[in-house]
């Protein structure tokens, strides 16, 4: 069993896209997977299937029902704003302790081979009134899968996020460079290679938007190999 926090170097870089691809690859290999996103903003109840929670359920092969949405993403807010701002509009005060309690409760009952806990926004985005995603990650202490983009400026955002994670002594399991949708974005392969050159030896995986998800299979196999090593060493 392995557990990872899926973080973003920026907002909308493709965290859920990456999580879904990893879930599909893990299941295709005959292993179990599950996911949890404690807080979600920009949620449209009439289009629940298109939400991050709905996409995660689809990747898990589960129907998008109210009960399952509550299980995978218990705090869902309508406004497309930072979670504490969206929550405030609905009369809810989001706190770090509440998110930690929800996350730890999920971690205590999940036993899949691959367990992904996904943040909201970028590493330094506010996720509660008194916490950023970084604070939540620090409180949980999970190894991190960092998702970066390929838009102009993405390399700087990704490398900055890596440095910030290191200041909290968080383990960085991998960086996934998710291809940005912007057709005018810099060359994807070059962005991946430049990120690799400056990432300090962290494993880098390239995730094209419309290509074969071989990267996801490679990453899930690497994570499975780590699990086997930990088990044999125990």
Swiss-Prot record:
Pathway: Cofactor biosynthesis; biotin biosynthesis; biotin from 7,8-diaminononanoate: step 1/2. SUPFAM superfamilies: P-loop containing nucleoside triphosphate hydrolases. InterPro entries: DTB_synth_BioD (IPR004472), P-loop_NTPase (IPR027417). Its cofactor is Mg(2+). It is found in: Cytoplasm. Keywords: ATP-binding, Biotin biosynthesis, Cytoplasm, Ligase, Magnesium, Metal-binding, Nucleotide-binding. One of its GO terms (molecular function) is dethiobiotin synthase activity. Pfam families: AAA_26 (PF13500). The keyword Translocase does not apply. Its EC number is 6.3.3.3. GO terms for biological process: biotin biosynthetic process. It catalyses: (7R,8S)-7,8-diammoniononanoate + CO2 + ATP = (4R,5S)-dethiobiotin + ADP + phosphate + 3 H(+). Substrate binds at residue 41. One of its GO terms (cellular component) is cytosol. Mg(2+) binds at residues 16, 52, 118. Gene3D superfamilies: P-loop containing nucleotide triphosphate hydrolases. ATP binds at residues 12-17, 52, 118-121, 178-179. The active site is at 37. Homodimer. Catalyzes a mechanistically unusual reaction, the ATP-dependent insertion of CO2 between the N7 and N8 nitrogen atoms of 7,8-diaminopelargonic acid (DAPA, also called 7,8-diammoniononanoate) to form a ureido ring. NCBIfam families: bioD. Belongs to the dethiobiotin synthetase family. This is ATP-dependent dethiobiotin synthetase BioD.
């Amino acid at each position: 069993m392995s557990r990872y926090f899926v973080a973003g170097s920026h907002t909308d870089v493709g965290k859920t896209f990456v999580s879904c691809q990893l879930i599909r690859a893990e299941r295709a290999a005959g292993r179990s997977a599950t996911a949890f996103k404690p807080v979600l903003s920009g949620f449209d109840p009439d289009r629940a299937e298109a939400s991050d929670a709905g996409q995660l359920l689809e990747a898990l092969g589960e129907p998008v029902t109210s009960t399952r949405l509550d299980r995978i993403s218990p705090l869902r807010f309508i406004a497309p704003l930072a979670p504490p701002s969206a929550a405030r509009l609905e009369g809810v005060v989001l706190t770090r302790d509440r998110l930690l309690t929800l996350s730890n409760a999920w971690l205590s009952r999940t036993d899949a081979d691959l367990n992904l806990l996904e943040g909201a926004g970028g590493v330094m985005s506010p996720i509660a009134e008194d916490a950023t995603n970084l604070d939540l990650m620090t409180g949980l202490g999970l190894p991190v899968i960092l998702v970066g983009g390929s838009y102009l400026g993405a390399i700087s955002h990704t490398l900055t996020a890596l440095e910030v994670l290191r200041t909290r002594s968080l383990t960085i399991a991998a960086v996934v460079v998710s291809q940005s949708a912007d057709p005018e974005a810099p060359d994807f392969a070059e962005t991946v290679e430049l990120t690799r050159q400056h990432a300090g030896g962290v494993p880098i995986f390239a995730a094209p938007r419309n290509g074969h998800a071989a990267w996801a299979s490679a990453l899930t196999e690497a994570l499975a190999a780590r699990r086997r090593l930990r088990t044999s060493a125990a």
